[in-house]
Structure formats: C-alpha cells, structure tokens
C-alpha cells in the first residue's frame, strides 16, 4: 500500500512524453557552453585576503576530489563504461532529483509561498550540499533549470532525464577520449576568447527551449 502511494507522491506515476523527455535532455546539453563559462568564472573567484587559508584549503579539497573523479572514470572496456554510467549518471539522477525536486522543492514553495523563490532556494541547497565552493554557481544554475523542468511539468521524469544527460555526457566523453574517438572534452565549450558566440547561442536556444517546454508541458501537467 505504501509502495503504491510512493510513485504518485514522487511524481513518477505518469509516463513522460517521449518528445518532451528528449527535449529536456537536449536542453541540458544545449546549455553546456553557459555552464562551462560560469564554471570557469567561479573557479577564478578569490576569497578576501583574510580568508586566504580557507581558500587554499577549499582549492586543495576540490583538486583532490577532481583527482579522485578522474581516477574513478578510468575505463578499460565497455563493461566499465556501463558500470560508470549507472553509478555516476543513473543513480544520482534518480536519487538527487527525487530528493530535491520531487520532495524538497514543493515543500519550499509551500513554505515561502512563491514558486520561483522556492525553486531557487532548493537549487541553492542542491549546490551547497555538494560542498564545492568553486563549482557552486554552475551547479546552482543547473539546479534552477532542473527545478523549472519539474515545476512546469509536475513530472519527475524530466529533471531525472536532464540530470542523467548532464552526468552521462561527462562519463561518455571520458570514455570516448580514452578510446581515441574524441579529441577534446565538452568541458571546453564556452571557454576561450572567441567562445562568447557559443554562450550567446546557448542562452538563446535555452530560453526558446524552455518556452517550448513550458508550453508543451501544459498538456500533461
């Protein structure tokens, strides 16, 4: 009985429309240049001189975390790739979205009585809980994007799919680079002196895509 009520409560009971599901994933990938640009900006931020010791500690922690992640993503076969895709993309997509978007976000919206404020408070908590100061801004923005996917559709499958696409592209790119099929990382999109047009195009497509998603979602929410 409890299990039967769990799916409706988490907004997973309704099958997601195929075109919208792929649209949510595409929107996640479309904003890669913007996310990478904000990540580069965030990583170059500095704390006040009085907090230099804290900044050095935070940077050391994030460098160590990046090294662990890089070592973790060393894949030596298709089996390793599929396992990493499950661990890094599938599990976090379901776990984090069901916690933050399906459960916490509606509570925040009811608490503050403002959907937009509730979405961004949830996005703040989503980014904060990762404990990566120099990656806070891009993760905060991603959290807001995922929040609006859920708010517009009232269906958890869309933020889950977008979250999977975000993490999955990192695993897939790492796999393709290691096998020689890809020469450059998607993390470099939107970075560099001539990358402004990538960010501008990314922003325009994201705004248009979210307008389309909101309009199409009205028929299923």
Q: Model segments located where?
A:
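C-terminal membrane module of polytopic membrane proteins
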Residues: 164-221
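Transmembrane alpha-helical segments in integral membrane proteins
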Residues: 1-3, 80-108, 205-216
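Functionally important transmembrane alpha-helices
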Residues: 127-131, 135-189
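Small-polar-interrupted transmembrane alpha-helices in polytopic inner-membrane proteins
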Residues: 88, 92, 115-130
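Hydrophobic alpha-helical transmembrane segments
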Residues: 18-26, 82-86, 116-121, 136-137, ...
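Transmembrane alpha-helix/helix-exit interface in multi-pass inner-membrane proteins
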Residues: 32-47, 96-104, 132, 138
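Juxtamembrane helix-loop-helix connectors linking adjacent transmembrane helices
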Residues: 7-91
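Membrane-interface helix/loop boundary segments of multi-pass membrane proteins
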Residues: 95-121, 151-154
């Amino acid at each position: 009985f409890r299990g039967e009520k769990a799916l409706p409560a988490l907004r997973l009971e309704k099958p997601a429309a195929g075109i919208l599901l792929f649209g949510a994933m595409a929107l996640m990938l479309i904003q890669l240049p913007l996310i990478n640009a904000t990540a580069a900006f965030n990583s170059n931020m500095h704390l006040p001189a009085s907090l230099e010791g804290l900044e050095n500690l935070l940077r050391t922690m994030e460098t160590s975390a990046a090294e662990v992640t890089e070592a973790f993503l060393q894949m030596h076969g298709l089996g390793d790739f599929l396992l990493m895709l499950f661990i890094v993309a599938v599990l976090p997509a379901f776990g984090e979205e069901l916690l933050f978007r399906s459960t916490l976000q509606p509570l925040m919206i009811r608490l503050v009585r403002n959907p937009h404020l509730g979405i961004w408070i949830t996005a703040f908590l989503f980014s904060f809980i990762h404990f990566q100061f120099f990656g806070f801004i891009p993760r905060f923005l991603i959290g807001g994007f995922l929040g609006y996917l859920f708010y517009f559709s009232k269906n958890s499958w869309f933020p889950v799919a977008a979250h999977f696409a975000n993490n999955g592209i990192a695993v897939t790119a790492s796999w393709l680079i290691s096998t020689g099929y890809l020469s450059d990382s998607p993390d470099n999109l939107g970075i560099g002196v001539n990358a402004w047009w990538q960010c501008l195009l990314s922003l325009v497509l994201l705004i248009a895509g979210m307008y389309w998603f909101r309009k199409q979602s009205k028929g299923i929410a």
